[in-house]
């Protein structure tokens, strides 16, 4: 008797997989299990909730019940999976268990909170649930410290500034977006943030947080202090691998999978932010969409290896939006930057004269797709 496909998780990756499976098979048994409410929301919207005065509930697009009815699923929200018996093909919660033919881990990633004194005072904005827990504090806060100047930190800094709040952003790198691009490319956005009033503390390190009568005191290196009303950790994500580890699967940074999204167990797969595909963790929407499409075929008996083309990453900073693609983080590229009032085009060229990466901003973003076609796959 068929036990069907069980998916652990209910985020973007899980939903994309369900939709792709149902395009090909309307009847295969599908079960989704997740610790949250399983309501659908658009996670990138979290970068703009403050300036748009949105509450957590405003983000909901579709209830779990509507999703289950539309796609003929069994849903188990607010359910923590405690163990996976890979050999027996069983997943277990505290009081239930489910058998599976194929299991998909779509457990996502959790926000990394720096291990400093007072770390419990830091907020994270990695889910609708996390925003719901702190939305009143963030709405009322006038002074905000953002720890981390990467993609999410830069988006949040601009959003809070647009909402009229006093924003300080701290990062130990010498420039924002340091893991994505060199400083000569990110400087245009960095200057815009500064012009808007964001106080950038680069080459700086947070050492501790302490509650005071009037807010939160952040202690930095070089005997500096700043007092704020809220502190947000935007220091990256860590793939959720605990369940996979307990199941005996191979783990590195994420749950290791091959080009078929298959883990070290032949009937267990991983998808989305938790997955490490052939050594790469790709926590962006487009690779997740493509991965879900290929995995659906493979779960239903196909044999389709994932092929990822060069893809755009969008940085949603409305006052100066950016699109980037290729190996922008490579340190051996020679960057050719054309910056004008209407926008910037930065091309990363290797020693053989080939385009390997690009970053475009503002009105020059319309050139992104033509540039994308010239990148190596």
From Swiss-Prot:
A cellular component term, taken from the record's GO annotations: cytoplasm
Pathway(s) where this gene product acts: Nitrogen metabolism; nitric oxide reduction
Cofactor: FAD
Alphabetically ordered keywords of this record: Cytoplasm, FAD, Flavoprotein, NAD, Oxidoreductase
Taxonomic superkingdom: Bacteria
Catalysis performed (reactions): 2 reduced [nitric oxide reductase rubredoxin domain] + NAD(+) + H(+) = 2 oxidized [nitric oxide reductase rubredoxin domain] + NADH
Compartments reported by the entry: Cytoplasm
SUPFAM superfamilies: FAD/NAD(P)-binding domain
EC number: 1.18.1.-
NCBIfam families named in the record: PRK04965.1
Family to which the UniProt record says this protein belongs: Belongs to the FAD-dependent oxidoreductase family.
Role played: One of at least two accessory proteins for anaerobic nitric oxide (NO) reductase. Reduces the rubredoxin moiety of NO reductase.
Protein name, per record: Nitric oxide reductase FlRd-NAD(+) reductase
